[in-house]
Amino acid sequence: MSYSRIKSYAKINLALNITGKTSKLHKIESVVGFVTLHDVILIKKIQSKKHIISFKGKFSKNIGPKNTISKLFKFLEKEKLLTSSKFEIKVNKYIPPKSGLGGGSMNAANILKYLIKKKFINPNKRQLISICKSIGSDVALGLNSTFTILKSNNQIKEFKNCKKFNVLIVKPSFGCSTKEIYSGVKKFTKPRFNKPSKKMFSFDNLKKLNNSLEAISLSKFPKLKNIKHFLEKSSNKSFVRMTGSGSAIVAYFKSKKLCDDVKKKFSRKYKNCWCKVAKTI
């Protein structure tokens, strides 16, 4: 059997608000998009007693045996949704970890989507929600890589054919611990995205929004503050925002030329930072 090839796109939070907290998790609402930056997953069914999962690429170094993909298969087998089939999976990692780009969660989401599409598993809606929750809060968002509003009650509303943006994604040599950044949350905002509409994805509207976690990450890591300030100074025709809990910062542009120009300036100034031009999908 030959490998199936899957593109696992990076997730970006164009805006994010913390609206409260349950006993375990913070309640969030977010404007979510996906960009052309992606990991490449090769998957095929094999005759074996166990799954074979391997990672390669620049951002594969610290991925251990307990990862989102192994967690997915463990849960599917525990719930007897996947009983006898075993798979070999090779992941080429292009999305940096601990960046707020959801690389690991999107890998699990795309493999889950593949298993459903190829009829290896057939979960009902309740089971699907349970699978996603068992792996990570972003996984449900990755089942359809499109512009999405995540409401504070965890409901997801998807939007097709939204205006696309050019983006410059930058990440310093360090990452942010999601747990650590969320532990710094001291106040909540009222839900603002409970009536989602396509106009929320307009450039002018997005410019007015923010990411509630950004101030915490920027305070903890002054270098992030400097990076954001540099990107904002480089162009007044863009807006700049951290994605997720960081440490990646994204600059949004209408013009590809402007995006490329700012990348050149940034690369000259911050030689040790990773940066990538991409586009929303």
Predicted regions and their residues:
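Solvent-exposed alpha-helices and their adjacent loops that cap or buttress functional pockets
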Residues: F34, S134, L141-G142, F159-K163, ...
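Short beta-strand scaffold segments in enzyme catalytic cores
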Residues: L16, D39-I43, A140-G142, T148, ...
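Conserved, helical-rich catalytic subdomain that frames metal- and/or nucleotide-binding sites
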Residues: H51-I53, N144, T148-F239, Y252-K257, ...
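Hydrophobic C-terminal alpha-helix "anchor/cap" residues
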Residues: V32-V35, L76, C132, L231, ...
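ATP-binding N-lobe of GHMP and related small-molecule kinases
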Residues: M1-S99, I116-Q127, K171
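Glycine/serine-rich anion-binding loops at beta->alpha junctions
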Residues: N92-K117, S137, F239-F253
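Conserved phosphate/ATP/ADP-binding segment of small-molecule kinases
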Residues: F59, K66, S70, I129, ...
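Contiguous, small/hydrophobic- and glycine-enriched helical/loop subdomains that border
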Residues: L112-S152
